[in-house]
Design a protein with these regions (language model features):
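Alpha-helical elements of Rossmann-like donor-binding domains used by nucleotide-donor carbohydrate transfer enzymes
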Residues: 17, 32-36, 74-75, 102-109
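Acidic catalytic loop of the alpha/beta-hydrolase fold
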Residues: 63-68
Length: 116
């Protein structure tokens, strides 16, 4: 299930390392994560109050992330005036570990904007 969250283009060594790190969680951790994200951590009604003039918001989603799809991200961004969205091609749910070089192509421009 978790391996499907990683883009197939990710380097094999990074893919393996990402899966190894995730597998270190005990039984039930992933199920608990999903419950939190969908029930306890459901902030859909609160996102409208985010003031992007006070705190810019950049939403980056990997195209292979089925746990937080591009559609989910776009729907959330539509509720937050000023939110910036980037769908990251050839990346999944763990972009920083599954393909660090590809992730840099997306995160560095965001960091440059923030630094201005």
């Amino acid at each position: 299930l978790i391996s499907g969250l990683i883009a197939p283009q990710s380097p094999a060594v990074s893919r393996h390392e990402t899966l190894w790190m995730y597998m270190q969680g005990g039984p039930g951790v992933f199920k608990g994560d999903l419950y939190f994200y969908r029930v306890d951590g459901d902030l859909r009604e609160k996102v409208k109050s985010i003031d992007t003039k006070a705190c810019p918001l950049y939403l980056l989603t990997g195209e292979y992330d089925f746990s937080c799809t591009a559609e989910d991200t776009l729907r959330t961004a539509a509720q937050i005036p000023g939110a910036q969205v980037q769908i990251m091609k050839e990346l999944g749910h763990f972009p920083m570990s599954e393909n660090p070089e590809k992730f840099r192509e997306y995160i560095l421009p965001v960091l440059e904007k923030i630094a201005r």
